[in-house]
Amino acid sequence: MKNNKPICFYDIYCFKPQECFKRNDINLLEDKLKRYSKITFLRNKENPEIIFLLGGDGSFINFINQQWKKNVKIVGINYGQLGFYSSYDSIKTINLDEIIDENMYYNPLLLKVSINNQNFFYCLNELSLFSNELVSFDISINDYPYEKFRGSGLLFVTPSGSTGKNKTAFGPIIFNNHENFIMTEIFPVNHLKYSSLNAPVVFRKDYKISLTNIKFKKSFSVAIDGNIINFSDKINDIKVETIQASSKIHGLNNFKKYIDKLNKSFIKGE
């Protein structure tokens, strides 16, 4: 009998091979896909439509930062602690009806960072600019002067990154289906002669932030999603804007699951 079911090509990436082997998760997932009645799933490493990522948030972030230009759907199965980018905590809990639902996928917002107008970086979570001593920036919003900041540094975060360092710095949490980004000041200097706004600012996704006249004494670090970027040249200016990834993340726009993760990770009841 001819198989008239639609075909979906997929692949599986496991970032913790020993854990995958111990759980037998790859075999369990492949078996689950084979038994699904509505679609024929075929593994295709060269050109998958769906990629199942087995790992923690760190592995997920690194993967997206490298593969964001590819038009592929990504489903996360959590092997870490928080699992903010994962839709499921185990193979057993995977709902294949949700996997094939186009409405369950969302193109995440990324930060596009340019340094000295020649070095370009992309981050799913956050850009951290930090110094153990005093650092100062002239900040412009859409090429209009905003303020001169003096303090330990600045954080720029996407909605999906707002529960990280930004939360620790008392920045706002933004739900993933809101297309904004945040600038949060880190330990700003405030006294009688000088003070900055000393409050997080939420920007629309089409805003562009420029940092110029960057001054610091000895050390100044630039971190893209936790990865320190080293520069041999002097940093004269930094520009931050956003782009939409071509890749789609499963469940990222599901506010009910997001609230459940917030409760599980941060909120304690009686």
Swiss-Prot record:
Its EC number is 2.7.1.23. Its cofactor is a divalent metal cation. Pfam families: NAD_kinase_C. GO terms for molecular function: ATP binding; metal ion binding; NAD binding; NAD+ kinase activity. GO terms for cellular component: cytoplasm. InterPro entries: ATP-NAD_kinase_N, ATP-NAD_kinase_PpnK-typ_C, NAD/diacylglycerol_kinase_sf, NADK. Its main location: cytoplasm. The keyword Acyltransferase does not apply. Belongs to the NAD kinase family. HAMAP family: NAD_kinase. This is NAD kinase. The gene is nadK.
